[in-house]
Amino acid sequence: MQEFTGVWVRDPRIQKEDFWHAFMDYEVCIHTNSLAFTKKSSCVRRRFSEFVWLRKKLQENALLITHIPKLPPKNPFFSLNNAKEIGARMEGLRKFLEAVVHSAVLLSDSCLHLFLQSQLSLKKIEACAEGRTRYTVSEAIHSFSSGHKRFDSLCEENMEEEQCVQCESE
């Protein structure tokens, strides 16, 4: 059987932080039969700044071994209401992830797997990848994966203390 990994970036949503500040996040889904992934299907929500963080992490971890694909350009005048701009950004993010998941060197990065298959915050992804949590990468993916909204810090701390068997935030 031939190995495949499909990546989708879809369902853009405006998230309001407060009256003056809002951002767009996207549903990032993968479907694969690759043994490199813990789960065969998953969906998480990520925002553009998190993709920027991921690219930087991949660059740091891969050093000069491989070329890191480019992200779509950051537009300071990006409109949350312009369907054409949003569509172009989603396509650019999809192409970035497609290139990343088809690179053997980048596919070995724990941050990538946690980014794609868990709803952990960037801070928690970093801590888990560096072995500074009580849970492994695989455990994090199973516990903090699709079907769950982002866990608040209290729930994440409970899991670290092995008290959070099935935390679902509403």
Swiss-Prot record:
Residue ranges annotated for the PX domain, each copy included: 4-122
Pfam families: PX
Mode of membrane association: Peripheral membrane protein
Main location as per UniProt: cytoplasm
Cellular compartment(s): Cytoplasm; Endosome membrane
Domain of life: Eukaryota
Assigned keywords, A-Z: Cytoplasm, Endosome, Lipid-binding, Membrane, Protein transport, Transport
Positions contributing to a 1,2-diacyl-sn-glycero-3-phospho-(1D-myo-inositol-3-phosphate) binding: 47, 74, 89
GO BP of this protein: cilium assembly; intracellular protein transport; vesicle organization
Gene Ontology terms, MF aspect: phosphatidylinositol phosphate binding
Keyword Membrane: yes
InterPro entries referenced in this protein's UniProt entry, alphabetically: PX_dom (IPR001683), PX_dom_sf (IPR036871), SNX10/11 (IPR043544)
PROSITE patterns: PX
The UniProt record lists the keyword Membrane: yes
Cellular component per GO, a single term: endosome
Family recorded in the similarity comment: Belongs to the sorting nexin family.
Role according to the record: Probable phosphoinositide-binding protein involved in protein sorting and membrane trafficking in endosomes.
UniProt domain comment: The PX domain mediates interaction with membranes enriched in phosphatidylinositol 3-phosphate.
Name this protein carries in UniProt: Sorting nexin-10B
